[in-house]
């Protein structure tokens, strides 16, 4: 333990801590809104809503900290945002107890997929250009969001963009910190902060008994398994691979699904490997040295602990920020990741067409057969890859 603490102290950096904080900030300011919508549809109490947030925050914290320390890799976990969107469409046709049962079913199935090793084999089968095209497509909307935010709060967004350019030139390591300070300062002085009452209190998790039904299993558990594996773990592992980390999928999926199992009883949806926010912790902005970026994963987990303990209060605090500031912050923070993934996708001449098809299908937002554009981008891109590049029979 003493050796571990000494190593953590030596490797700690402010830039990695900021990267971890920004990942939590974006998670709470974006996907968490879907949770509020689901809670309203389910007509749950404020106490139950806080329990949900406590469960997903602590679940993401424990897995992220453990895996980041274990593999010295910036492993960032979160809750399934696509799965949460499913809840909005299903409530109030299913009860909260049925939803919890579906979470448990999904966690068990995902755990079995992880420990059998089949997911690792699937990951090795996907070419780097296809994975990069998919990731660029996922992140592209955030780059667009940066400039779309100028429609409503142009002064704040353009000031953040200018601050980004200046700090990238003179203080690149703490660039995003200056951008955050700039955005908050302009929002405050222009009176654009959201009027949210702050009341700091400790969260108390609520136990929810599961109630199995075929309806919730087929309409929530099964889609949750698919979107978690194809829309979260798959791009999440692809990001790790593209960032130069060869962490196996088996322990990550196993740890996340076990955390999901326990979080479910407090109302927490499936814990998954983060894809979008993970890029914040894996680039040079987190740390110049790749081997020291794991601190960002640990910092991310620690901020999630704070978010879980003060669930209601922390969410209210993040809710102060205007959505345009959050959109601009996310877009600027992910510019480097967007550029690097587009570069990798277009790097090899042979893979360029399949990678471009993957990118366009992913960024399209298509939902054919109810499955996400991430899934279809990967499938269509792989189909193009095998048709165009498979050796012809002599």
From Swiss-Prot:
Membrane topology annotation: Multi-pass membrane protein
Keyword Cell membrane: yes
Record InterPro entries: Benzoate_Transporter
GO function terms (MF aspect): benzoate transmembrane transporter activity
Localization per Swiss-Prot or TrEMBL: Cell membrane
This protein's record includes keyword Protein biosynthesis: no
Any Gene Ontology CC annotation: plasma membrane
Pfam families per the UniProt record, alphabetical: BenE
UniProt entry keywords in alphabetical sequence: Aromatic hydrocarbons catabolism, Cell membrane, Membrane, Transmembrane, Transmembrane helix, Transport
Biological process terms in GO annotation: catabolic process
Segments crossing the lipid bilayer: 16-36, 49-69, 74-94, 99-119, 139-161, 176-196, 220-240, 252-272, 301-321, 325-345, 368-388
Other comment: The ben operon encode the proteins responsible for the degradation of benzoate to catechol.
Alphabetical list of NCBIfam families matching this protein: benE
Role description: Probably involved in the transport of benzoate.
Name of the protein described by the UniProt record: Benzoate membrane transport protein
Lineage: Bacteria, Pseudomonadati, Pseudomonadota, Gammaproteobacteria, Moraxellales
Gene: benE
